[in-house]
């Protein structure tokens, strides 16, 4: 990751034959690979050492030169250069083709680039390339024009001659016939013989006429063809073409195959073509104009870059280095080889055969066939299976071509460039480590020793426990006692990273300080399980070791688990006590009436604990205790004369006192019962107001107390705890009666089936709720199940209802609700039929979960891809704009209450303008961070909405600015410059994706009054929104304000708007069963929804503009997540929506260099217009374009990022043709080329920091004997040798080398 080799751009282009020969170290002439006896590469073959370099370090092929001292010498016997064997990974060869071939990507890709350039249909192009038709490559217009009259005369003479010959022949036959007839009559022959002679003569005449007419027609055909012959004409009739060539060959040239294409490209005038196309675009319309636009894109690509279109036809094929297509010997003496070798072998074989045929001067038809086969061989090498049947290997498996090496999850991009395997890592099963502190993890001794091996070895040598590295290595491998002491010393303060797959968000990798533990399992702190989504049923985790001092510093400062208490998606704590801890703290803080010691007064906490130990006092009894350092809570009635800091006598319970002792000393007294909600509030408050150290310590205290008291609470579950409510049969009987009544009405035909279903479902839902309510009342407060659910430790009331109350209604395999309920509970046991019905839902649940996981993962991948280059690049973009966000709404009584979504909308944002009250006093200045406190103050002052900065209105040209983004939810402070907010947004939206329901719900029959339409919800709805698809059953929205009239016909309804401004009426045809949201004669406003159903975001953009479209998308996405009770901050959705609306479609190009119909980044569009306007020319006009996330990712400026996402070959084809440069601004591009990512500490503003020691430090440094004579202070530059660097063993002199 060094910065020495840094470059700012990466360009891709078309390679010409010269480039290919320039890269090559020699020509591969033979298809041989290695000699099977000697196992050495064959000369001039695919693994030849002369071309690709020696297969053993510093050794030539024939063995004349061995050893490093001959470095660089080229052996005169075998011609191999003496060098390292690893050059076989980088040296390329080439194959000189006997005939040119076209590059399949450019002719077969969609759209066909070659076809667009030469204005040929792909079908015709294929005919030419594969030798099915001739193509005219040039016509000598002047000569033809000059000679045409003479040629016409010659043609006429020849034609006349043919006619004369024909007539002469016919006359001769007629004469012969007359003679024959006369002879027959003389012989007195019968009439039949005469008829026979006549028929024979007629047949002869007909044949002569037919033959002659065919010749005349062919002559006419050839002449017409020649008269109208022009470049690019195709001729599939070989005979006609031959005759044309024989007669008029001097006036034109034509050929077949890639040669024809090559000749055309050589004589192609790009500039003239470009001017012609621009003319068509300016004046043409319809199909002609769109085709011209598409062609102009291709022509322009070659005009504006130094790419030559001849690069699309190859005269030489590059051969990739042999180590990248290896051949390895298997156990049985057989060889396994890369598919590429087979494909290259076919190319070489066919090429050599073609050369031989050309030398022999074989007939054209044979040569053409061989050329076609060569073309096909090169096609399958580049992209097997793109055209025709793929070439298969043994077992009918298609061979993997060069394109397949790049594509897909197993391709080069995703397998090796974006995700690599790393050293210094290990994995093991996890177990719980309740004794750990929040920032610690337990690391098994053996694992730690293996991970820290090089560090341990160096330290052993430093401490003189070992003479050299080799003996140190032996000591480590034999587990000598000194090794453990050294290991203990080394791992102190050296954090390790723990990761659990799937890593759905940034909390899936955190840093911990390792503690050595016995056994082989990693120990994990219970509070971080939530972040990792880990449990201890056999989950595994991976450990990674940060090596460099910078990496360790980042791990400690940014990634330590105690610094990651908040969830990046909503800014709320993720390290909340759960399950056992909650039940323990709940047990500690409940109050019990009438238990031992109630009403007593204690002089101190110790006295109360003594009474508790003596069994005189119950933990939960209400008593009075004198407390030191009591901090009152709001609402506490202080005794007269009491002052803060004095001891206070508080009425509480001992458990409550013990609970409050776990909180910080200056934290206000908590009197509430510590259930899940209360604990969440406390941790939230701690995170907001206290330093991280205090918060982490408090969380550890809560965890310890929770486990301690959970153990002592004796919470268990017995079957006797499950009490079926006595009133159940009575309630059921009442509802049975009502259900029977409904069924009766249906039998009499008073209601239809849909209504019956609806009524029954309603009745049984009521019954279920009634039984659930009765069941909750009948459970005693001390019932353990009640305590578990009430405290929020585990389970919910719905589960309890199914165990102790009633199972209720279930769905059938189609997902429709069955109108007969399961009346038993699990405690009573289900009947066979009930059990069978219940299994449907269970099976469906499992299937859905599996599908959901895959879909959700793919959604996250697309989101990351579209937003990966959104990084905070500057402090403030200086915009005045923002979004107006409500913070308070009026409730049903007209009183103001806090908006329920304020947590995810206004919270953690920056104010865009001053907030002023009715008297003009500034309550909060612009630029203030809206925390809980500020929002609370504004709410109390009666403010209902505020204008806040948003990513959507940010004016930074790349990325976004810190003020528009606001507070970083993960840290609770203003976001740092360099924070990759795009990726955090993608993770925050993708991570809860698995919890979203999969299906489009269908509750059977007419659920919504809209005729029981499927309402797409959950994950499919999120995908539909982010992909900007038009939803199913879309509802029209009013395009203008005006009066509406409804016209009904047999088949459909028409909604007609008469606009207020007098423009022409707008009609919307809708289905008759649609549910109208307006009535005849209503007045509608722009953008108002007319019928029930989902709205198409593209229509919102078209009619109401980009602002409304952005708001619509954010609200809709949030609606889906909120319906499932998942809180995500609006700003994350906004980052994605901003990326979807980043581009503009150019309508008129004005005098700018933009093409009409082109998709341009908004920043590029605005820059081009600014430039044109400043020169006093006409600017381009455009309309904002809403792109789905997949399309937006593929349309990115960075071709590396797009190619590694999807449709790799298509992206690379286009990028190479346009000679695209990748500015390397995003994260993926930099990961691919192995540079530090331009985010966080990888930004130049951090990497170019140099550390200068103070004078004092310099003086101290040189007092003792220094380990380094030329000490470097540039520790961040990494040039000095900082302490604890791992020693690469290959480069280390092992001293006693016995080899």
Swiss-Prot record:
Keywords: DNA-directed RNA polymerase, Magnesium, Metal-binding, Nucleotidyltransferase, Transcription, Transferase, Zinc. Pfam families: RNA_pol_Rpb1_1 (PF04997), RNA_pol_Rpb1_2 (PF00623), RNA_pol_Rpb1_3 (PF04983), RNA_pol_Rpb1_4 (PF05000), RNA_pol_Rpb1_5 (PF04998). It is an enzyme of class 2 (transferase). It catalyses: RNA(n) + a ribonucleoside 5'-triphosphate = RNA(n+1) + diphosphate. Its EC number is 2.7.7.6. GO terms for molecular function: DNA binding; DNA-directed RNA polymerase activity; magnesium ion binding; zinc ion binding. Binds 1 Mg(2+) ion per subunit. Binds 2 Zn(2+) ions per subunit. Its cofactor is Mg(2+); Zn(2+). One of its GO terms (cellular component) is DNA-directed RNA polymerase complex. Zn(2+) 2 binds at residues 877, 954, 961, 964. SUPFAM superfamilies: beta and beta-prime subunits of DNA dependent RNA-polymerase. Zn(2+) 1 binds at residues 60, 62, 75, 78. Transmembrane segments: none annotated. SMART domains: RPOLA_N. One of its GO terms (biological process) is DNA-templated transcription. Mg(2+) binds at residues 535, 537, 539. It comes from the Bacteria. The RNAP catalytic core consists of 2 alpha, 1 beta, 1 beta' and 1 omega subunit. When a sigma factor is associated with the core the holoenzyme is formed, which can initiate transcription. DNA-dependent RNA polymerase catalyzes the transcription of DNA into RNA using the four ribonucleoside triphosphates as substrates. Belongs to the RNA polymerase beta' chain family. NCBIfam families: PRK14906.1, rpoC_TIGR. This is DNA-directed RNA polymerase subunit beta'. The lineage of its organism: Bacteria, Bacillati, Actinomycetota, Actinomycetes, Micrococcales.
């Amino acid at each position: 990751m060094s910065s020495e080799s840094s470059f700012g751009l990466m360009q891709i282009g078309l390679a010409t034959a010269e480039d290919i020969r320039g890269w090559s170290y020699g020509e591969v002439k033979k298809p041989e690979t290695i000699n099977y006896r000697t196992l050495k590469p064959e000369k001039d073959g695919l693994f030849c050492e002369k071309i690709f370099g020696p297969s053993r370090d510093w050794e030539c092929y024939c063995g004349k030169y061995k050893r490093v001292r001959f470095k660089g010498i080229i052996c005169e016997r075998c011609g191999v250069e003496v060098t390292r064997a690893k050059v076989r990974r980088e040296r390329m060869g080439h194959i000189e083709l006997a005939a040119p071939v076209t590059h399949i990507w450019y002719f077969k890709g969609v759209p066909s680039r070659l076809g667009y350039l030469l204005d040929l249909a792909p079908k015709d192009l294929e005919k030419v390339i594969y030798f099915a038709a001739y193509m005219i490559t040039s016509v000598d217009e002047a000569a033809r024009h000059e000679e045409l009259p003479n040629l016409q005369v010659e043609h006429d003479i020849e034609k006349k001659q043919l006619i004369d010959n024909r007539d002469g022949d016919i006359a001769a036959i007629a004469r012969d016939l007359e003679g024959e007839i006369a002879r027959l009559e003389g012989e007195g022959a019968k009439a039949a013989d005469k008829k026979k002679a006549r028929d024979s003569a007629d047949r002869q005449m007909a044949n002569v006429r037919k033959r002659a007419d065919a010749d005349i027609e062919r002559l006419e055909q050839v002449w017409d063809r020649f008269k109208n012959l022009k470049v690019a004409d195709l001729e599939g009739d070989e005979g006609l073409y031959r005759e044309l060539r024989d007669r008029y060959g001097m006036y034109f040239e034509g050929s077949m195959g890639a040669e024809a294409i090559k000749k055309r490209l050589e004589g192609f005038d790009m500039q003239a073509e470009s001017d012609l196309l621009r003319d068509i675009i300016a004046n043409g319309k319809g199909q002609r104009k769109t085709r011209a636009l598409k062609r102009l894109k291709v022509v322009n690509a070659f005009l504006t870059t130094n790419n030559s279109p001849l690069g699309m036809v190859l005269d030489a094929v590059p051969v990739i280095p042999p180590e990248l297509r290896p051949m390895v010997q298997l156990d049985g003496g057989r060889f396994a080889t890369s598919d590429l070798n087979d494909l290259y072998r076919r190319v070489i074989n066919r090429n050599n055969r073609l050369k031989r045929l050309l030398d022999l001067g074989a007939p054209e038809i044979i040569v053409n066939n061989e050329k076609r086969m060569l073309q096909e061989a090169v096609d399958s090498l580049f992209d097997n299976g793109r055209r025709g049947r793929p070439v298969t290997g043994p077992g009918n498996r298609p061979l993997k071509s060069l394109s397949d090496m790049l594509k897909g999850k197993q391709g080069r991009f995703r397998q090796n460039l974006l995700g690599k395997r790393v050293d210094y890592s290990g994995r093991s099963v996890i177990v719980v480590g309740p004794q750990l502190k929040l920032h610690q993890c337990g690391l098994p001794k053996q694992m730690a020793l293996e991970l820290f091996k090089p560090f341990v070895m160096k330290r052993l040598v430093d401490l003189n426990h070992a003479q050299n590295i080799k003996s140190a290595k032996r000591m480590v491998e034999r587990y000598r006692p000194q090794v453990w002491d050294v290991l203990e010393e080394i791992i102190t303060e050296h954090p390790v990273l723990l990761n659990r797959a799937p890593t759905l968000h940034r909390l899936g990798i955190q840093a911990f300080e390792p503690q050595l533990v016995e056994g082989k399992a990693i120990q994990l702190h219970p509070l971080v399980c939530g972040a990792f989504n880990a449990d201890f049923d056999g989950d595994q985790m991976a450990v990674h070791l940060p090596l460099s001092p910078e990496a360790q510093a980042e791990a400690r400062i940014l990634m330590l688990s105690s610094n990651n208490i908040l969830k990046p998606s909503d800014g709320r704590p993720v390290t909340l006590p759960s399950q056992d801890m909650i039940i323990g703290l709940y047990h500690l803080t409940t109050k019990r009436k009438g238990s031992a010691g109630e009403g007593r007064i204690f002089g101190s906490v110790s006295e109360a604990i003594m009474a508790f130990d003596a069994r005189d006092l119950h933990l939960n009894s209400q008593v009075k205790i004198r407390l030191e350092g009591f901090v009152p809570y709001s609402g506490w009635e202080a005794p007269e004369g009491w002052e803060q800091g004095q001891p206070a006598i508080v009425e509480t319970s001992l458990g409550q006192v013990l609970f409050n002792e776990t909180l910080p000393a200056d934290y206000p007294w908590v009197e509430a019962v510590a259930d899940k909600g209360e604990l969440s509030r406390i941790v939230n408050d701690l995170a907001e107001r206290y330093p991280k150290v205090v918060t982490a310590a408090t969380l550890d205290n809560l965890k310890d107390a929770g486990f301690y008291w959970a153990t002592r609470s004796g919470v268990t579950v017995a079957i006797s705890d499950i009490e079926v409510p006595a009133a159940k049969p009575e309630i059921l009987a009442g509802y049975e009666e009502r259900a029977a009544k409904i069924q009766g009405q249906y039998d009499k035909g008073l209601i239809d089936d849909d209504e019956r279903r609806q009524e029954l479902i309603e009745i049984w839902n009521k019954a279920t709720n009634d039984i659930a309510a009765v069941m909750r009342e009948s459970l005693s407060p001390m019932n353990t199940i009640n305590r578990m659910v009430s405290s929020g430790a585990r389970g919910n009331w719905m589960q309890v209802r199914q165990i102790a109350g009633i199972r209720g209604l279930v769905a059938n395999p189609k997902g429709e609700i069955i109108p007969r309920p399961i009346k038993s509970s699990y405690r009573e046991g289900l009947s066979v039929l009930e059990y069978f019905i219940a299994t449907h839902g269970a099976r469906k649940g499992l299937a859905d979960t599996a599908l959901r996981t895959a879909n959700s993962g793919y959604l996250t991948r697309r989101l990351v891809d579209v937003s990966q280059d959104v990084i905070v690049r500057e402090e403030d973009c200086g915009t005045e704009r923002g979004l107006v966000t409500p913070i308070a709404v009026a409730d049903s009584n007209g009183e103001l209450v806090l908006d329920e979504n304020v947590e995810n909308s206004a919270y953690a944002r920056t104010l865009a303008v001053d907030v002023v009250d009715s008297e003009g006093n500034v309550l909060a200045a612009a630029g203030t961070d809206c925390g809980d406190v500020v929002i609370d103050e504004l709410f109390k002052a009666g403010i209902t909405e505020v204008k806040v900065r948003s990513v959507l209105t940010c004016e930074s040209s790349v990325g976004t600015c810190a003020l528009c983004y606001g507070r970083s939810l993960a840290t609770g402070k203003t976001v740092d410059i360099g924070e990759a907010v795009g990726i955090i947004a993608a993770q925050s939206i993708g991570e809860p994706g698995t919890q979203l329901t999969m299906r489009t719900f269908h509750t059977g029959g007419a659920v919504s009054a809209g005729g029981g339409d499927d309402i797409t919800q959950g994950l499919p709805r999120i995908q539909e929104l982010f992909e900007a698809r038009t939803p199913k059953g879309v509802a029209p929205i009013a395009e203008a304000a005006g009066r509406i009239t409804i016209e009904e016909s047999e088949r459909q309804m028409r909604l007609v708007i008469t606009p207020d401004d007098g423009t022409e009426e707008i009609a919307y045809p809708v289905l008759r069963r649609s549910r109208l949201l307006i009535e005849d004669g209503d007045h509608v406003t722009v953008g108002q929804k007319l019928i029930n159903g989902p709205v198409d975001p593209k229509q919102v953009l078209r009619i109401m503009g980009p602002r409304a479209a952005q708001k619509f998308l954010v609200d809709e996405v949030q609606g889906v997540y909120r319906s499932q009770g998942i809180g995500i901050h609006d700003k994350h959705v906004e980052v994605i929506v901003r990326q979807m609306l980043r581009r503009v479609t150019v309508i008129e190009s004005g005098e700018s260099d933009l093409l009409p119909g082109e998709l341009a980044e908004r920043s590029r569009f605005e820059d081009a217009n600014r430039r044109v306007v400043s020169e006093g020319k006409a600017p381009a006009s455009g309309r904002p374009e809403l792109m789905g996330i997949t399309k937006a990712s593929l349309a990115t400026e960075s071709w590396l990022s797009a190619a590694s996402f999807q449709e790799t070959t298509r992206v690379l084809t286009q990028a190479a043709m346009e000679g695209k440069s990748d500015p390397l601004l995003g994260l993926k591009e930099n990961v691919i080329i192995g540079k530090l990512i331009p985010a966080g500490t990888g930004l130049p503003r951090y990497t170019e920091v140099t550390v200068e020691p103070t004078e004092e430090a310099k003086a101290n440094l040189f007092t003792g004997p220094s380990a380094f004579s030329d000490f470097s202070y540039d520790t961040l530059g990494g040039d000095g040798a900082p302490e604890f660097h791992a020693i690469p063993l290959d480069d280390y002199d092992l001293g006693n080398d016995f080899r």
